[in-house]
């Protein structure tokens, strides 16, 4: 917890300008439908940074931190399968919940969030899945609300920066390595995955959180949890 407190305090005390400079200088890791990610270090400790685009609608005072479906999207768009999604504030809400569970000793199976900040950001293009706006609108039902959401993302001038505990592997990568190693490693890994997924899912559901994007490339592991 001392390391968490140190990193959290360091980030919280940076001005928007200084924090933006740190994020801009971070090592890029990738980008996709959920935003862009990078790796920075605070006193030698790796910190995973995720930037999720915020629309002008998200930034209206009455909508800040709202998890509502502001654009009136079809409900199937909330699944993380390449759709326009419901908004960045939902992601913040989830990380706030899971971090507090870890800090409160209720469940240790989530990466902790050190800090979050809204930062100016106009350098991101639409992700590949939405880049062809006409095609994406048609694929997701053709409704005007879908078009408004995608075009709002396209015109985004800010992002939600989430500063998270760095977990080195996706479950997909790690499990593939274990299965290819030998039978004993594969059995041990499969047992760990089954137990952790069952425990984590049961805990989240009991606390009122339902995860719609729990595929193996969106689950992280350090080989122990």
Language model features with spans:
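C-lobe/activation-segment region of protein kinase-like
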Residues: 184-187, 206, 224-225
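Conserved ATP-binding subdomain of kinase catalytic cores across diverse folds
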Residues: 15, 20-162
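Protein kinase catalytic-loop region centered on the HRD/HxD motif
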Residues: 201-209
């Amino acid at each position: 917890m001392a390391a968490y407190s140190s990193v959290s305090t360091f980030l919280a005390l940076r001005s928007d300008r200084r924090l933006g400079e740190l994020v801009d200088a971070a090592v890029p890791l990738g980008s996709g439908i959920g935003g862009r990610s990078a790796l920075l270090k605070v006193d030698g400790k790796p910190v995973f940074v995720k930037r999720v685009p915020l629309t002008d609608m998200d930034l209206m005072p009455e909508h800040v931190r709202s998890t509502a479906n502001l654009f009136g999207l079809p409900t199937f768009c909330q699944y993380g399968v390449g759709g326009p999604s419901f908004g960045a504030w939902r992601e913040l809400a989830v990380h706030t919940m899971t971090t507090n569970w870890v800090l409160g000793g209720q469940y240790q199976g989530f990466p902790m969030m050190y800090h979050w900040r809204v930062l100016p950001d106009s350098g991101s293009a639409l992700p590949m899945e939405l880049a062809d706006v006409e095609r994406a609108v048609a694929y997701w039902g053709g409704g005007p609300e879908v078009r408004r959401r995608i075009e709002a993302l396209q015109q985004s001038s800010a992002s939600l920066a989430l500063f998270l505990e760095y977990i080195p592997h996706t479950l997909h990568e790690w499990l593939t390595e274990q299965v290819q190693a030998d039978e004993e490693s594969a059995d041990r890994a499969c047992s760990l995955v089954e137990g952790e997924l069952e425990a984590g899912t049961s805990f989240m559901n009991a606390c009122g959180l339902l995860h719609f994007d729990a595929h193996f490339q969106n689950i992280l592991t350090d080989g122990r949890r």
